[in-house]
Swiss-Prot record:
The organism of origin for this protein: Arabidopsis thaliana
Keyword list, A-Z: Ascorbate biosynthesis, FAD, Flavoprotein, Oxidoreductase, Signal
Its EC number(s): 1.1.3.8
GO biological process terms, semicolon-separated: L-ascorbic acid biosynthetic process
One Pfam entry name: FAD_binding_4
Stated name of the protein: Probable L-gulonolactone oxidase 4
Single GO MF annotation: FAD binding
Lineage: Eukaryota, Viridiplantae, Streptophyta, Embryophyta, Tracheophyta
Catalytic reaction(s) noted: L-gulono-1,4-lactone + O2 = L-ascorbate + H2O2 + H(+)
Cofactor(s) this protein requires: FAD
Amino acid sequence: MSFWLSLIFCFFTFASSSPPDDPVNCEFGNTMCTVTNSYGAFPDRSICKAAKVEYPRTEAELVSIVAAATRAGQKMRVVTRYSHSFPKLVCTDGKDGTLISTKFLNHVVTTNPEAKTLTVESGVTLRQLIEEAAKFDLALPYAPYWWGLTVGGMMGTGAHGSSLWGKGSAVHDYVTEIRLVSPGLASDGYVKVQVLSETIDPEEFRAAKVSLGVLGVISQVTFELQPMFKRSLNYVMRNDSDFGDQAVSFGERHEFADFLWLPSQGKVVYRMDGRVPLNTSGDGLFEFFPFRSQLSLVLAIDRSLEESEESLEDANMKCVRAKLVSSSMFLMSYGVTNNGLIFTGYPVIGMQNHMMSSGSCLDSRQDGLITACPWDPRIKGQFFHQTTFSVSLTNVKSFINDIKALVKIEPKSLCVLEGSNGILIRYVTSSLAFLGKEEKALDFDLTYYRSKNDPLAPRLYEDYIEEIEQMAIFKYNALPHWGKNRNLAFDGAIRKYKNANAFLKVKEKFDSLGLFSTEWTDQILGLKGNVTIVKQGCALEGLCICSEDSHCAPTKGYLCRPGKVYREARVCTRVSS
């Protein structure tokens, strides 16, 4: 079976691999361009175009580009090296806008070991940030697990790791200063460079910490770091019978706690992970298996099996493969090793810079796509939806129990999630950022099958996933992750942020002409229009919530029906003739 081949090859870090393509492709030099994300498709599968792309290498060049576009009244959007956001955050309106890539704004500016601060350009990746800090025995305490994100991208979407400790797990809450290039008046030369900090410009700073790219282009960011430390990691798999209670309190006991929930199997993998003294013995390394380069042939075989299960509606085989994935990943410790080579047992102890993030499939030489990141759109590989939202700790137990109730109705219904290693659940806490998290919460990350070629193809047990999605967002008032999700998750989301109006005031101050705003950002910020798109089959890919059968796939037996546990939900359900 292809999965086992994948596991065998996962033991090796390929010396040659094919890093991802540039998200921007142009017909003539840097003009007549299209832009996409690292998965090759946005939630609505639209093609985003721009008149040109600019690649500034210095802040001076960036200032010149923004001034010229402002003078011309051109729309602008920022695109990062890998463009990992699912929603259309990189798209300009129409085809006449300008894309500003931070691909070459990737330098370290200054390091101050005494003050424990590090200033970098916004195109610096998380990997670069971690490595540069480690040179001075410093560490970023919390970060996402994927190191291919850029500093500007993380701040634009509120990216985070997992913790309730300190200031919480969001990267932007460890930022002390932001340099932002915004449109200006003619008297300003059509551009302004804003230097923002909590002490001098608290309102503007709190807006810029999570900005969705609508305030301008982040040029530089200064981080407040901590002395280097070690972590001790242990994964434990348990029955999920008391998971609702454990989820509420576990994060208070373990600084870097998270969970992998396997609801169809009734199991949870607990991450017991905390700091230990720097002189503790251990040279552990976490290189997450799914983030390593994998053979394109193996990925194609695996995808073909997945497509076959869907077309044949073979839930039994889907569940068998899901158990193989989850049990094998657990047995092989998800890619963590005690010495950088092999896993010999828990606990695994290692330096923070070696334990916090990974993503080696990004970093190797071209090999003609013999190997690639698993989701690279140039090959037949993974293609998926990602639904991610944070549920308040006060509501988490009830939400977990509702999911369990769905599983009780049909135990096979959530095997599709376990084929992607289960529901990843991370801790987040309240942030001073206007569009950051509002309170202590658990962030649920659901990754599941999406048809590559047919947006009107229904998915096996899709009604169960849709009900969880709607239950979280509407019953439990969950906040969507700004850089993930399908359209419907953002419906009315801005009303859940108590400081939304304060953010919009700063937006008006920095970009009164809306040159960095688009139809999409106006929709998610509640300024104009709606994020949902109502048309035939729109509910199948989360573009709408169904209100009639035509929004599903009636010719294939999928009709719009109420939810099974959350009756207010409206989901596309397979109805037997």
